[in-house]
A protein has these predicted regions:
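N-terminal signal-anchor transmembrane alpha helix
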Residues: 6-31
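Membrane-embedded alpha-helical segments of multi-pass transporters/permeases
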Residues: 24, 73-74, 149, 166, ...
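Loop-to-transmembrane alpha-helix initiation sites
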Residues: 138, 154-161, 173-185
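Cytosolic, membrane-interface loops and tails of multi-pass inner-membrane proteins
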Residues: 25-58, 118, 198-215
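Transmembrane alpha-helical segments that form the membrane-embedded catalytic/substrate-channel core
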Residues: 17-25, 98-112, 187-196
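Nucleotide and nucleotide-moiety/phosphate-recognizing core
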Residues: 7, 11, 57-61, 67-113, ...
Length: 215
């Protein structure tokens, strides 16, 4: 059991460190010599980066946030799978993925190297759920895409994942530990989107367009 906790803490620390590599902040600060957090919504995420800077460097943000999630979960699996306590009802890969995924998201949202001012975790989170289980990903991504296409509110689709991920996790695994981890993940997503939710309710949230809207 002692070795398990050492491995669990190591997986969490590495996943958090991976999450701290925020693509929007890195590209804006070190390539564009600017800070995406000083523009638009102030969020260090893909949507605000695209609205502010646009262009091909957006793909650099996507690549960074996707790769860090992959690395976090691969390392988490290497450290944990085969070393978890006996008797767990679910697949070991699921426990390691949810554990590493949670801390990767915390690193993305609260990066120690960027004054704990990060993004809202949707791109990294979307990558994580794809790696966890295609059924969880289908529900989360499906709900996100449907809501965004119907309403043009990225924040509405993003916020919905805070609900759909725990629900789909329970439907797929029927496991209390995985449900708890998914609720913590979903709760952080909703918390990071609390301002967007308030603006949605007030009718003042900005809609998303790939091109500037013609007035």
């Amino acid at each position: 059991m002692g070795e398990f906790w050492i491995r669990a803490v190591a997986a969490a620390a590495i996943a958090y460190f991976c999450g701290c590599f925020n693509g929007a902040v890195i590209v804006s600060k070190y390539i564009l010599r600017d800070d995406v957090r000083t523009h638009g919504s102030g969020n260090a995420g893909l949507t605000n980066f695209y609205r502010t800077f646009g262009g091909p460097l957006t793909f650099g943000v996507i690549l960074t946030d996707v790769l860090k999630a992959i690395v976090a979960l691969v390392v988490g699996g290497w450290l944990l799978v085969g070393h978890l306590p006996a008797g767990l009802p679910g697949p070991q890969e699921a426990y390691s993925d949810y554990w590493a995924g949670l801390f990767c998201l915390l690193g993305h949202m609260f990066p120690c190297m960027f004054q704990f001012k990060g993004g809202k975790g949707i791109l990294s989170g979307g990558t994580i759920v794809i790696m966890i289980d295609w059924r969880v990903a289908l529900v989360a991504w499906g709900g996100f895409l449907i809501l965004v296409l119907l309403t043009r509110y990225v924040s509405l689709g993003s916020s919905s994942t805070g609900v759909t991920v725990p629900i789909s996790t329970w439907l797929v695994y029927h496991d209390g530990i995985l449900l708890l981890l998914s609720i913590i993940i979903g709760g952080h997503i909703l918390w990071k989107h609390r301002g967007n939710i308030q603006r949605l309710l007030a009718g003042t949230e900005s809609k998303f367009y790939f091109h500037k809207k013609v007035k």
